[in-house]
Amino acid sequence: MKKYKALHFGAGNIGRGLISDIYMKNNMDFALVDIDKDLIEKLNKQKSYSIIDFQTNKVFQISNFKAFSIDQEDEIKKWIEQADFISTSIGWSNLASLKKFFENVKLKEKAQIICFENGYKISSFFQSILNIDSNHFVNASVDKIIPNFKSDSLDVYVESYYEIILEQKNESQKKLNFVNYSTDLEAYINKKLFLVNAIHSTIGYLGYLKKYTYINEALNDQQILFKIKRLAKIINEILSKEYLLFKVDYLNDYLEKNLKRFSIKENQDLISRVARNPIQKLSKNERYFLIYNLVKKHNLEIDILLEIYKSIFYYDNKMDKESSKIQSTIENKSLAYALKKFSNLDQEDQEKILKSLAKK
């Protein structure tokens, strides 16, 4: 049987630590593309690396792959034309930079394009950028914690748990093993986006305010945990109202499972990693705005959500470009101006945040 081929943009943690693993377990020929030339050179020179489960110490070897620098346009285009699966994990705000690779290129008839990105239906968003037949695009929900361990090694340390759910479009669709498929992907995207991504980053922002370094440290703080539980209660109410397949008890269990994942000491998940790119996290196809919209729709308590928004605007990390942009806007203009520019909140809710600060 002829092997499927896959091309993946993004040789970072998710690309090396999850997507390559899936492609290799599916016995596929695959290639990685990245903007980091040193990383690509290392991958080509070493020709293999290990994925190490930090919970069980199991090791899985990744090998027999190709690796291309982003400036190897001709090679990348050849792979795009030959690929059965084309995927990304570069951050959805960077997807427009890939448009040139799809110009004057003929995809295979049943080629699938999958964006393994945090956000709402990002593959559909990518389709709007490329303006290619939507039948090629498969939306995805992907969940795995892969911390940034400081090391010169290509090896990746990962948690045991992972979940990938892909959109089931039709019966003739080529399927990957070791992933799940659903015809109701929106429900699963939002469940993961709200109860994994939003909860995770919120722990980060609240933890930063109390000067913690790691997520597990912040989660041991009872004041932070209390706020997380308040936010989660609202989220669970939203999800159970929006999607009949989710009962509140199931969502509570799902939350507790995720809190246990986040609290694993060996994880060593840096708050600076989890809280990065706050402007992106506040955008309209991301976690906080989607929760905000549904809170307004169902007329639920909004105070805890606005408190979380406030903590995001207090996040001041000089090493993070988006955080620095927010802070310089506050410094050079005002918090009111920054809220208007970045929060996407209604005017009345921006004013509630400002009034809550004025009372202090």
From Swiss-Prot:
Record has Cell membrane as a keyword: no
UniProt key word Oxidoreductase: yes
Entry EC no(s): 1.1.1.17
One matching Pfam family: Mannitol_dh_C
Residues in coiled coil: none
Any one of the GO BP annotations: mannitol catabolic process
InterPro entries: 6-PGluconate_DH-like_C_sf, 6PGD_dom2, Mannitol_1_phos_5_DH, Mannitol_DH, Mannitol_DH_C, Mannitol_DH_N, NAD(P)-bd_dom_sf
The entry's keywords: NAD, Oxidoreductase
A GO term for molecular function: mannitol-1-phosphate 5-dehydrogenase activity
Catalytic activity: D-mannitol 1-phosphate + NAD(+) = beta-D-fructose 6-phosphate + NADH + H(+)
One GO cellular component term noted in the UniProt record for this chain: cytosol
Binding, NAD(+): A6, L7, H8, F9, G10, A11, G12, N13, I14, G15, R16, G17
Similarity annotation: Belongs to the mannitol dehydrogenase family.
NCBIfam families cross-referenced by the UniProt entry: PRK02318.2-4
HAMAP family for this protein: Mannitol_dehydrog
Name of the molecule in the record: Mannitol-1-phosphate 5-dehydrogenase
